[in-house]
């Protein structure tokens, strides 16, 4: 059985990156929350 985590920087950026977050309203809400919390890193 193969492991479930098969790292790929491209997939990581496409799924969890800043531009991916900005596309949807929910994603923008996530960024807003992270800014409010004071996170230094907003997205992957």
From Swiss-Prot:
Family: Belongs to the bacterial ribosomal protein bL34 family.
InterPro entries: Ribosomal_bL34, Ribosomal_bL34_CS
GO CC list: ribonucleoprotein complex; ribosome
Keyword Ribosomal protein carried by entry: yes
GO molecular function: structural constituent of ribosome
Matches recorded under PROSITE patterns: RIBOSOMAL_L34
Encoding gene (name): rpmH
Ribosomal protein found in the keyword field: yes
GO biological process: one example: translation
The protein's name: Large ribosomal subunit protein bL34
Species of the source: Rickettsia prowazekii (strain Madrid E)
Keywords recorded for this protein, A-Z: Ribonucleoprotein, Ribosomal protein
Superkingdom of origin organism: Bacteria
């Amino acid at each position: 059985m193969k492991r479930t985590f098969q790292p790929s920087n491209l997939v990581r950026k496409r799924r969890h990156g800043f531009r991916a977050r900005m596309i949807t309203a929910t994603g923008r809400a996530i960024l807003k929350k992270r800014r409010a919390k004071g996170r230094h890193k907003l997205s992957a």
